[in-house]
Curated annotation (Swiss-Prot):
PANTHER family: METALLOPROTEASE MEP1 (AFU_ORTHOLOGUE AFUA_1G07730)-RELATED (PTHR47466:SF1), PTHR47466. Residues 1-19 form the signal peptide. Glycans are attached at residues 71, 136, 200. CDD domains: ZnMc_pappalysin_like (cd04275). Disulfide bonds join 222-248. It is found in: Secreted. The active site is at 186. The keyword Zinc applies. This is Extracellular metalloprotease MGYG_07913.
Amino acid sequence: MRFSVLLTGIAAAGSLAAAERSCGAVPPRAYEQEFTQALSSLTAEAASADLTAGITIDTYLHVLTDGQNGNISDQQLQAQISAMNQHYGQAGVQFRLVRATRTNNANWASGRDEAGMKRALHQGTYSTLNIYFIPNLSSGLLGICYFPRANPSQTTITMDGCMVRSGTVPGGSTTNYNQGKTATHEVGHFLGLYHVFSENGSCADADMVADTPAQSKKTSGCPSSQDSCPGGGVDSIHNYMDYSYDVCMNQFTRGQAARIAQAWRAFRAGH
């Protein structure tokens, strides 16, 4: 999943100003079918799992720099893990930082040679989270992450994980998106969550989660309210899987927590 910003310029203090986010990719077409098939093979207990499940994910953070850009302090890395643990606490998920790596490579720091970078740096298995912090993702992207797949090949495992713009960590330089919630959003895709809004402007059930109201458009900024599909409840402007400013995001639903637990058992647990 690609998560991007439309750049409006550089602020006086050197911060990266971002107008809004937009998505440049969609989940693999086979994902929902694979999810449904995998869910049908789970036990009734596992299939009904919810936010009480308790999932702990070993996590590796990789900091890419080009000699000048991309530096992230140890304190900011720990703050990112703490932020994710706070955000996902309501969904029963915690992240255990195993190790952080630092690599100075101008090519990788520009978002190029993703495969080469991941072959060199990826750690763990399909149940391990790797986040690559990159200062210059292409086309203004804030992040890219991969949905889980059934029966992953070794190449799929190596290419797994999330690439996130360095300036979005807590205290980072990306204005309106520097509370660590871009990583939280991207990891939602790693855990099997869709966006809460429709990708085609319809009021269909875009994310396959019953307790997120139908929403025909992404949220920009932090409005006081938004109701793009009247009759089913107001838009999920505070949900981590929308496109609001970081300050606006503070919620996963019980339905999303259940889907995370189900997808974890179907695709990642034990792999």
